[in-house]
Swiss-Prot record:
Mg(2+) binds at residues 199, 213. The gene is sucC. Succinyl-CoA synthetase functions in the citric acid cycle (TCA), coupling the hydrolysis of succinyl-CoA to the synthesis of either ATP or GTP and thus represents the only step of substrate-level phosphorylation in the TCA. The beta subunit provides nucleotide specificity of the enzyme and binds the substrate succinate, while the binding sites for coenzyme A and phosphate are found in the alpha subunit. Its cofactor is Mg(2+). This is Succinate--CoA ligase [ADP-forming] subunit beta. Heterotetramer of two alpha and two beta subunits. Its EC number is 6.2.1.5. GO terms for biological process: succinyl-CoA metabolic process; tricarboxylic acid cycle. Substrate binds at residues 264, 321-323.
């Protein structure tokens, strides 16, 4: 679950981290009033969406008058911002962040993620702030400096100083950087985050460090013990199908193709998408129904898949381990009847009672094609989409 920039900075303030004074506004009038609270300009106005690349898309602007603030708010509030990280529809702009402009001397980068290979929280710092860290990692990886947190001791001040020295910081900036490092690490651990990022972390012309931007990603599996973060969730920034799937504990990710995929198991789901692609098809989604492929869950999965108007056929790939394939077939038949599926459905069943399950599908009289193998299933669903 991602947070908006203004929400990230609210958390920074709670932990004593330096950030520009700013206010999130939902109307042009609130935006003008925010400028008055902040004081004399210039100000920076920023569209609040869960996507990067806002500046290049016109969603971030430095303004010198309240009239310009009102014009910016009127132009963006209620609209959708399209960036290189969004789809063609963009993300809705419901809030504008108005904050004091900062005299930027130098831009740095500081962030942390959970590194699966080392099984540690790893902090990354770079002198190349203000650009995508992925681009820096690809083109100049030697400019990224890392430290890993020991799960027994947690963050240590010497690690912050180590990063500061590698960034070439001196004097009071080392102390300020170490404080920010310790604060971010505390937020990361106490709030069950999966990602935290300040890009850029700015050295002002006055010689101080300030968190000019903030990006936080919470671990969705830990939200049950983070009520404050749950309240910050903005579902308007999420795909409605993904939100609906989450309510049924279905793992769904929308894609750009026209072949809906329903699979039990994340690895099998990825393999299914690969083989569909291999045979010339384009997956419309990733959908893992998990181990409990009941009629209710399968029905809901069909509803979610078919809510995408681009879907021209559905491939169901189920491995019956704990759950018997004949029971899964009953669920698929019931779901197809209830939902009223009007596109071809190709089903591949493997495992416990697979033959009985395939027979039930064949005898159902519905527009369900029982495949003999995964390759056969991929070929048949691609052919169905192509009208062959």
């Amino acid at each position: 679950m991602n947070l908006h920039e203004y929400q990230a900075k609210q958390l920074f303030a709670r932990y004593g981290l330096p950030a520009p004074v700013g206010y999130a506004c939902t109307t042009p009038r609130e935006a003008e009033e925010a400028a008055s609270k902040i004081g004399a300009g210039p100000w920076v106005v920023k569209c609040q969406v869960h996507a990067g690349g806002r500046g290049k898309a016109g969603g971030v602007k430095v303004v010198n008058s309240k009239e310009d603030i009102r014009a910016f708010a009127e132009n963006w509030l209620g609209k959708r911002l399209v960036t290189y990280q969004t789809d063609a529809n963009g993300q809705p702009v419901n809030q504008i962040l108005v904050e004091a402009a900062t005299d930027i001397g130098k831009e740095l980068y500081l962030g942390a993620v959970v590194d699966r290979s080392s099984r540690r929280v790893v902090f990354m710092a770079s002198t190349e702030g203000g650009v995508e860290i992925e681009k820096v990692a690809e083109e100049t990886p030697h400019l990224i400096h890392k430290v890993a947190l020991d799960p027994l001791t947690g963050p240590m001040p010497y690690q912050g100083r180590e990063l500061a020295f590698k960034l070439g910081l001196e004097g009071k900036l080392v102390q300020q950087f170490t404080k920010i490092f310790m604060g971010l690490a505390t937020i990361f651990l106490e709030r069950d985050l999966a990602l935290i990022e300040i890009n850029p972390l700015v050295i002002t012309k006055q010689g101080d460090l300030i968190c000019l931007d903030g990006k936080l990603g919470a671990d969705g599996n830990a939200l049950f013990r983070q009520p404050d973060l749950r309240e910050m969730r903005d579902q308007s920034q999420e795909d409605p199908r993904e939100a609906q799937a989450a309510q049924w504990e279905l793992n769904y990710v929308a894609l750009d193709g026209n072949i809906g995929c329903m699979v039990n198991g994340a690895g099998l789901a990825m393999g299914t998408m690969d083989i569909v692609k291999l045979h010339g098809g384009e997956p419309a989604n990733f959908l893992d129904v998990g181990g409990g492929a009941t009629k209710e869950r399968v029905t809901e999965a069909f509803k979610i898949i078919l809510s995408d108007d681009n879907v021209k056929a559905v491939l169901v790939n189920i491995f019956g381990g704990i759950v018997r394939c004949d029971l899964i077939a009953d669920g698929i038949i019931g779901a197809v009847e209830e939902v009223g599926v009007n596109v071809p459905v190709v089903v591949r069943l493997e495992g416990n009672n697979a033959e009985l399950g395939a027979k039930k599908l064949a005898d159902s009289g519905l527009n369900i094609i029982a495949a003999k193998s995964l390759t056969d299933a991929a070929q048949q669903v691609v052919a169905a989409v192509e009208g062959k």
